[in-house]
Swiss-Prot record:
Zinc finger (C3H1-type): 75-107, 119-145, 153-177
GO BP: any one term: defense response to virus
Keyword entries, A-Z: DNA-binding, Metal-binding, Repeat, Zinc, Zinc-finger
A cellular component term, taken from the record's GO annotations: plasma membrane
Entries under InterPro entries matching the protein: Unkempt-like, Znf_CCCH
Name of the protein: Zinc finger CCCH domain-containing protein 20
The keyword Translocase is annotated on this UniProt entry: no
Location of region: Disordered: 207-226, 334-359
One MF term in the entry's GO annotations: zinc ion binding
Length: 359
């Protein structure tokens, strides 16, 4: 028999015995001690808590399950309207996008930030057909999330399921406390007068009302109050400075006008009833009025004298007093007649005090 034929008759099977665990060096550290197996299971259980899973959490309270349960930590209104599917996800590993509240590249649920892009809560008809040419510049909402998570529509209507709602992200309110009441004005028109407080609004209406009476001292009080209110509503520091400067300028003009008219009245009426010195110095030393004054004040010198030139009124000094004394002496004392001895001395006007001017 040939050697090759001897192997053709039978096929021997080799049996390898199992390696004893006591001699295995790779598991000796875990199973060598009596507590090794339990510690390994605890480590795996702790690790399982941080891995994504579709199984419900056995430790969760069934009474807390619902649309606003603590399982979803992102249920506040602000996060849902401005952060949900808007902020980019920072995770590096692959995970379930439907359970992640953040946006991912190429995700259909991605939303535009309503604080940066001005679009309404109305669904875009072109996007429903399949494609919108305007893209992110469109003024309408693209998709269900942009439409119902828009600040103008989110939780403005009650949920038909109420407390029995099991949606992970629900766009509707489940209790009266969750219903959001929208203001009357548009969110884009934050600078309108509708957002002003009732007190400021009434003050603004009173300031522009034609029946409002201005104070007698400030004839432009209504316009000043209107400008001041408008500057506060716009929040402009430059406007406040300009309004304050205009108000101070107006008050200074009013004070100057009142002071000038008061001095003219006192000077005019005092010339006939006051001391003769005041009456003599009236036409020569009267200051230039800042505003036109009414004629007709009593002054005994205005009937016989012409108005002094402007340059003469602004001059001052000893030379002016000498010229004034000479002029007064010629025009008022040349025609004076010596007193009659029979008449009393009280009828003669005393002008001796004029000599004090040249001293």
């Amino acid at each position: 028999m040939m050697i090759g034929e001897s192997h053709r008759g039978f096929n021997p099977t080799v049996h390898i015995p199992p390696w004893p665990l006591s001699e295995d060096l790779t598991v000796s550290d875990i199973y060598g001690s009596p507590d090794g197996g339990s510690s390994m299971m605890e480590a795996l259980a702790e690790l399982q808590r941080y891995l994504p899973s579709n199984e419900p959490d056995p430790d969760s309270d069934p009474d807390l399950s619902g649309p606003d349960s603590p399982i979803d930590a992102y249920t506040c209104d602000h996060f849902r309207m401005y952060e949900f599917k808007v902020r980019r996800c920072a995770r590096g590993r692959s995970h379930d996008w439907t359970e992640c509240p953040y946006a991912h590249p190429g995700e259909k649920a991605r939303r535009r930030d309503p604080r940066k892009f001005h679009y309404s809560g109305t669904a875009c008809p072109e996007f429903r057909k399949g494609c919108c040419k305007r893209g992110d510049a469109c003024e309408f909402s693209h998709g269900v999330f942009e439409c119902w998570l828009h600040p103008a529509r989110y939780r403005t209507q009650p949920c038909k399921d109420g407390g029995n709602c099991r949606r992970r992200v629900c766009f509707f309110a489940h209790s009266p406390d969750q219903i959001r009441v929208l203001p009357n004005q548009s969110p884009d028109r934050v600078d309108s007068f509708d957002v002003l407080s009732p007190t400021i609004r009434r003050a603004f209406q009173f300031s522009i009302s034609p029946s409002s009476n201005s104070p007698p001292v400030s004839p432009r009080g209504d316009s000043d109050s209107s400008c001041s209110l408008l500057s506060r509503s716009l929040g402009s520091n430059l406007g406040n400075d300009v309004v304050a400067s205009l108000r101070n300028l107006q008050l200074n003009k009013v004070k100057s006008s009142l002071s000038s008219s008061y001095n003219n009245q006192i000077g005019g009426y005092g010339s006939g009833f006051g001391s003769p010195r005041g009456s003599v110095l009236g036409p020569g030393f009267r200051s230039l009025p800042t505003t036109p004054t009414r004629p007709g004040f009593m002054n005994i010198w205005e009937n016989g004298l012409e108005e002094e030139p402007a340059m003469e009124r602004v001059e001052s000094g000893r030379e002016l007093r000498a010229q004034l004394f000479e002029k007064l002496s010629k025009e008022n004392c040349m025609g004076r007649i010596e007193p009659d001895p029979d008449q009393g001395a009280g009828d003669t006007p005393d002008v001796g005090w004029v000599s004090d001017l040249v001293m």
